[in-house]
Design a protein with these regions (language model features):
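Short loop/turn segments at secondary-structure transitions that flank enzyme active sites
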Residues: 79, 167, 176
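Glycine-rich short-loop/terminal segments
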Residues: 1-18, 22-143, 147-152, 189-216
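Beta-strand residues in well-ordered beta-sheet regions across diverse protein folds
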Residues: 29, 171-172
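Catalytic nucleophile-His microenvironment captured as a short glycine-rich beta-strand/loop
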Residues: 144-171
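A short, polar/proline- and glycine-enriched secondary-structure boundary/capping micro-motif
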Residues: 178-186
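Short, solvent-exposed aromatic-acidic interface loops
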Residues: 172-178
Length: 216
């Protein structure tokens, strides 16, 4: 694809978009280090820049209804990552525990080149905090990724990690909260994680999110 044919389109956070008209419709690409990536089909894009907290709040607005909206944590984490990329989406009402067979670790296939890292949580709280934080901070300010947790009781969960300055921020888009990392570490047996903001998405990601509908 010859990028010189495309005009610079909208700007969302740090992501530039290129576009051209195909069969009367605008098609968009994300410019990543001068390499154009075609945008995912059938997903709308945000019309304005939103804060991280605003994007998190939009991911799973039906959480209070219970049911599937409390069993879709992977969809919620994915929706947050897509919203930070400029997509106007929310989590699909899919029981992602069933959709992924409830297994950990698992390569979800939402990203090209995803590589799952594992962190066995030490029993010493202070050591656990330092060791995991050091692992995440090495990715650098502004980086973002998926965190999957195997709790000590055998259950699992999915959330988002971000690096903000010299701090690790853990977001739970399923219930719209910023999490105390030390609490997660105390309750967890194993963390599985990988960085997402530097990876390209696959079409499979569209199966677990839907276009945002503020009227729901």
């Amino acid at each position: 694809m010859d990028e010189r044919k495309y005009k610079v389109g909208d700007l969302y956070e740090r992501n530039h978009f290129r576009r051209r008209k195909i069969n009367g419709e605008w098609r968009y690409w994300r410019d990543d280090n001068n390499r154009a990536e075609e945008m995912l089909p059938n997903l709308k894009r945000k019309t304005s820049i939103m804060t991280p907290n605003g994007d998190m709040a939009a991911c799973n607005r039906q959480y209070s209804k219970g049911g599937v909206y409390r069993n879709n944590c992977i969809s919620c984490a994915l929706a947050y990552d897509l919203r930070r990329r400029g997509y106007d989406v929310e989590a699909a009402p899919i029981d992602t525990t069933s959709a992924t067979n409830g297994s950990l670790p698992i390569q979800l296939g939402f990203y090209k080149g995803e590589k799952l890292e594992m962190f066995e949580v030490p029993s010493d709280d202070e050591a656990a905090m330092k060791q995991f934080s050091d692992r995440i901070l090495k990715y650098g300010d502004g980086s973002r990724g998926l965190l999957r947790i195997r709790w000590k009781n055998g259950d699992g969960h999915a959330a988002i990690w971000e690096v903000s300055g010299d701090a690790v921020v853990i977001r739970d888009p399923q219930n719209n909260t910023i999490v105390d990392l030390s609490d997660y570490l105390r309750r967890a047996k194993t963390f599985y994680y990988f960085r997402t903001d530097n990876l390209k998405l696959t079409d499979k990601a569209t199966e677990f999110v839907r276009n945002y509908n503020g009227g729901d």
